[in-house]
């Protein structure tokens, strides 16, 4: 009965042709432990500083329900009717102003980080394939996982390059990785790094970056630690991001030997009309200048690679606001990027997370 129904629904002419040689192996070779893959994931970037490329990137980014947590039927008309028609024109010259010869700073530095981890693991005798992916844009997560699988990786460690956990950053990477892996017939074993906001390797590299900058340029009156903002409702719903940011700031302050009154913790990149985490970075800088603070350094510990938010929003827009309010000296301390201590620290973090997996000689 079932066989007759099957033949009726799927006639023979629609079934795949039987190969000349049966691919089924009755005596398959023994399955080894497989290889280990490391997937580093950052946020993403347009392919080029043009309106079209920016529109495609923003369309993917802002369509993620983890990023914009309002009903789709309300948000999608706004996104396609207003945001994607207006924002690309405004952002194109800003991206062009920070573009490097090799491409987008975020992509260039992330590629260097991946290359550094690859070399660092090999130097330690850890056999692992390393790929870089972007949550939005290229190289995509599916493409990177496919590349790892084609090289025999059946264990994959995903490392979202966000020190502080947030549902709109780290969790959406987990969503994307598991969604793609879930479609595979032979699924790899997966691990994820949830956060590394208080990891000694990260804290030491970030503190060292600041100390090295001060050794070369001197110390300011105030150090502003600016983190990417989030809507307050995200925290009220249980997101630990705010706590993670404060923990990172405290650890850096203690490592640098600074008093509490020498450091300001602020939040940047507000989007939309909702109330976000406060204090906001730009108004805080202007207020510091009005209070008589003439020298500030700004560091962005939540960004491990420089991007539009650091090179344009902080280094240019916030500088202008500080100077316009009476400040004299504004300096942006670059992100960790590909500085050797961070590459070493990131390699340490990855190596620890790979323990128990087959990373010996393949």
Curated annotation (Swiss-Prot):
Reactions catalysed: heme b + 2 H(+) = protoporphyrin IX + Fe(2+)
Key words of the record: Cytoplasm, Heme biosynthesis, Iron, Lyase, Metal-binding, Porphyrin biosynthesis
Cell location: Cytoplasm
GO cellular component: cytoplasm
Residues binding Fe cation: 228, 309
Main localization (coarse): cytoplasm
EC number assigned by the record: 4.98.1.1
GO MF entries: ferrochelatase activity; metal ion binding
Keyword hit for Metal-binding: yes
Gene Ontology BP, a term: heme biosynthetic process
Pfam families referenced in this protein's UniProt entry, alphabetically: Ferrochelatase (PF00762)
Disulphide-bonded residues: none
Alphabetized PROSITE patterns for the sequence: FERROCHELATASE
Pathway(s) served: Porphyrin-containing compound metabolism; protoheme biosynthesis; protoheme from protoporphyrin-IX: step 1/1
InterPro entries: Ferrochelatase (IPR001015), Ferrochelatase_AS (IPR019772), Ferrochelatase_C (IPR033644), Ferrochelatase_N (IPR033659)
Similarity section: Belongs to the ferrochelatase family.
Purpose: Catalyzes the ferrous insertion into protoporphyrin IX.
Protein name: Ferrochelatase
Annotated gene: hemH
């Amino acid at each position: 009965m079932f066989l007759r129904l099957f033949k009726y629904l799927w006639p023979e002419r629609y079934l795949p042709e039987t190969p000349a040689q049966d691919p089924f192996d009755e005596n398959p070779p023994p399955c080894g432990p497989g290889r280990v893959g490391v997937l580093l994931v950052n946020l993403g970037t347009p392919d080029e500083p043009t309106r079209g490329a920016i529109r495609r990137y923003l369309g993917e980014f802002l369509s993620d329900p983890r990023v914009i947590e309002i009903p789709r039927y309300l948000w999608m008309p706004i996104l396609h009717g207003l945001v994607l028609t207006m924002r690309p024109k405004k952002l194109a010259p800003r991206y062009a102003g920070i573009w490097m010869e090799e491409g987008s700073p975020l992509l260039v530095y992330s590629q260097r980080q991946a290359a550094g981890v690859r070399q660092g693991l090999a130097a330690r005798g850890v056999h692992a394939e390393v790929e870089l992916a972007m949550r939005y844009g290229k190289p995509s997560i599916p493409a990177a996982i496919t590349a790892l699988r084609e090289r025999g990786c059946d264990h994959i460690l995903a490392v979202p390059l966000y020190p502080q956990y947030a549902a709109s950053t780290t969790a959406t990477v987990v969503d994307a990785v598991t969604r793609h892996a879930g479609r595979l017939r032979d699924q790899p074993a997966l691990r994820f790094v949830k956060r590394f906001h208080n990891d000694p390797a990260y804290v030491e590299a970030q503190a060292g970056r600041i100390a090295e900058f001060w050794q070369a340029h001197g110390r300011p009156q105030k150090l502003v630690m600016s983190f990417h903002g989030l809507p307050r409702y995200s925290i009220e719903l249980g997101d630990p991001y705010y706590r993670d940011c404060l923990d990172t700031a405290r650890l850096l302050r203690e490592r640098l030997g600074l008093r509490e009154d020498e450091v300001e913790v602020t939040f940047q990149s507000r989007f939309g009309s909702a109330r976000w985490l406060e204090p906001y970075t730009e108004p805080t800088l202007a207020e510091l200048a009005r209070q008589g603070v003439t020298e500030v350094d700004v560091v962005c510990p939540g960004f491990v690679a420089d991007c539009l938010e650091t090179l344009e929003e902080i280094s240019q827009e916030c500088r202008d606001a500080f100077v316009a309010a009476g400040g004299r000296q504004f300096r942006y301390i670059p992100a960790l990027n590909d500085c050797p201590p961070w590459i070493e620290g990131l390699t340490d973090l990855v190596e620890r997370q790979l323990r128990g997996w087959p990373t010996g000689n393949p």
